[in-house]
Amino acid sequence: MPGNRRQVPILHRDADFLLRALQPDDFVRTSRYENANREHLAPWEPLRDPGYFSVDNARARTLLQVASMDEGEALLLLLLDPDDGEVLGRCSYTNIVRGVFQACHLGFSLAAAAQGRGLMARALRVANRYCFEQLGLHRIMASHLPRNARSERLLESLGFEKEGYARAYLKIAGVWEDHVLRALVDAPR
């Protein structure tokens, strides 16, 4: 199955970052990332109870996420520091639907310390191309809060077109928030 993490190579490696699929033993490094960026990411994510940030919870989540990749339902990628292996960010292609749709949803986050260096734009260019060329997807959908100017600029720079506006779309930081809906569609083949 093309979505299987064992078949996903290292997608990118240079002096700035390594981009590869999540592995079962990544739970410690992802837990460190979540804890170090807890306040930075809180305005853009669902409310998290304190137990969410434990290593045990990270282990359980990682195993579920790896299983979803093994089933071809997701592609979950980590941006890693090439020197120390610490997580700089994440790209999540989830809810992969096959058949006549061939689409997924994209989510992403970047460490506070890694902001403003163009890392996520570079990583998503590589990962989006992989989704189209290797996974055979036709559409990648993403949404962002209207006030999240950084995500808006990033998605626009990658060619994601605005397709709509959804009222009370996702519960973010405890509040049902409106979202701008965007999509990147692969060129017809």
Curated annotation (Swiss-Prot):
Localization: Cytoplasm
GO MF annotation terms: protein-N-terminal-alanine acetyltransferase activity
GO cellular component: cytoplasm
Reaction(s) catalysed by this chain's protein: N-terminal L-alanyl-[ribosomal protein uS5] + acetyl-CoA = N-terminal N(alpha)-acetyl-L-alanyl-[ribosomal protein uS5] + CoA + H(+)
Keywords, ordered alphabetically: Acyltransferase, Cytoplasm, Transferase
InterPro entries per record: Acyl_CoA_acyltransferase, GNAT_dom, N-acetyltransferase
Enzyme class: transferase
Purpose: Acetylates the N-terminal alanine of ribosomal protein uS5.
Family label: Belongs to the acetyltransferase family. RimJ subfamily.
UniProt-listed PANTHER family: [RIBOSOMAL PROTEIN US5]-ALANINE N-ACETYLTRANSFERASE, GNAT FAMILY, PUTATIVE (AFU_ORTHOLOGUE AFUA_3G00765)-RELATED-RELATED
The protein's name in its UniProt record: [Ribosomal protein uS5]-alanine N-acetyltransferase
Organism the protein comes from: Pseudomonas aeruginosa (strain ATCC 15692 / DSM 22644 / CIP 104116 / JCM 14847 / LMG 12228 / 1C / PRS 101 / PAO1)
